[in-house]
Amino acid sequence: MLSAEHRAIVKATVPLLESGGEALTTHFYKTMLAEYPSVRPLFNQAHQQSGDQPRALANAVLMYARHIDQLEQLGGLVSQIVNKHVALNILPEHYPIVGACLLRAIREVLGAEIATDAVIEAWGAAYQQLADLLIGLEENVYVEKETATGGWRGTRAFVVARKVKESDEITSFYLRPADGGELLEFHPGQYIGLKLIVDGEEIRRNYSLSAAANGREYRISVKREPNGKASNYLHDSVNEGATLDLLTPSGDFTLEHNDKPLVLISGGVGITPTLAMLNAALQTSRPIHFIHATRHGGVHAFRDHIDELAARHPQLKRFYVYEKPRHDDEAHHAEGYIDEARLIEWLPATRDVDVYFLGPKSFMQAVKRHLKTIGVPEKQSRYEFFGPASALD
């Protein structure tokens, strides 16, 4: 039980987390992944090496400590965590491992003089409160997905019905249930989890669903990353007829249905969730402005599909920005990068729009800044990270 004294102690550690939280979480991951191999498949080693995962956890721990008296203020963060956990099939038995390693990291990084028995006790109680909250919320989602039409719990086998090269870097996989059963619906913008065995090692990854729900199959579109263990395995070793283990669709970066003009802005492989949103939005009459930035035509996936949609749907306007176009690239609307002048030109005159954007972090930082400058309300601009969440400001 988290007492008033526990809360006071946790809040008193906020300055320490602000200055040293990342060192603490880096030590935490190093310890946990070395000593508990059972949890390694749940974490992307590239995100560990880049520091993105420890940084994201440090921010989450800090936010929790700051709002320990008003957990309702964590609503958005809690929802993101629950969705990520469900897509990876995080289970109650994983939480004691995390808790033990977190408390150990607090003691070892802060030292016994600061991380006294009282501090460890307070953080132990605080962690248990958070774990109980997440376990309960996640169980609700697991039950909801298991009992829904076409739903399941844990993994379900899917067959690769088609494998299609979309660009020099991106390949799509069309996945149908191996049991021939019904398919769980999903919301445009959500992702799905894959459980893979690569070189004898289990790994789990999340990939955006890149086509609107059709009741027959899911589509993921995977960019080959130079050192990506999962993406290279999918590109090189998974062919039509292969079977993959999928976890249920998840994610809270989803299309909100209303009559406002819709603006979809993507960079690189960030196009994948916006495609599902685009296809769903075209079932309505709302105006759509689709803006995509990429390096050049060779890595521009789905161009023919979007051009064909624009030819059939007058409500859709699309704009392409090539950073370094090749001499034989098809026509594009601008060279370089998306900037304020181009957004002013390409967006509707009204700033009462709904904007969804996704891409590399530096791309999203620039887009967020430009949208704010030209007057798009911040509450109507939504974004998501591939991988651990971070701050754009």
UniProtKB/Swiss-Prot annotation:
Reaction(s) catalysed (UniProt annotation): 2 nitric oxide + NADPH + 2 O2 = 2 nitrate + NADP(+) + H(+); 2 nitric oxide + NADH + 2 O2 = 2 nitrate + NAD(+) + H(+)
Site, Involved in heme-bound ligand stabilization and O-O bond activation: residue positions: 29
Record-linked SUPFAM superfamilies: Ferredoxin reductase-like, C-terminal NADP-linked domain (SSF52343), Globin-like (SSF46458), Riboflavin synthase domain-like (SSF63380)
Cofactor note: Binds 1 heme b (iron(II)-protoporphyrin IX) group per subunit.
Keywords from the UniProt entry: Detoxification, FAD, Flavoprotein, Heme, Iron, Metal-binding, NAD, NADP, Oxidoreductase, Oxygen transport, Transport
Active site location: 95 (charge relay system), 138 (charge relay system)
Top EC class for this record: oxidoreductase
Named cofactor requirement(s): heme b; FAD
GO molecular function, one term: oxygen binding
EC number: 1.14.12.17
Record-listed NADP(+) binding positions: 268-273
Domain named Globin: residues: 1-139
InterPro entries in the cross-refs: Cbr1-like_FAD-bd_dom, FAD-bd_FR_type, FNR_nucleotide-bd, Globin, Globin-like_sf, Globin/Proto, Hmp, OxRdtase_FAD/NAD-bd
Marked site positions, Influences the redox potential of the prosthetic heme and FAD groups: 84, 384
Described function: Is involved in NO detoxification in an aerobic process, termed nitric oxide dioxygenase (NOD) reaction that utilizes O(2) and NAD(P)H to convert NO to nitrate, which protects the bacterium from various noxious nitrogen compounds. Therefore, plays a central role in the inducible response to nitrosative stress.
Protein family (similarity comment): Belongs to the globin family. Two-domain flavohemoproteins subfamily.
Name listed for the protein in its UniProt record: Flavohemoprotein
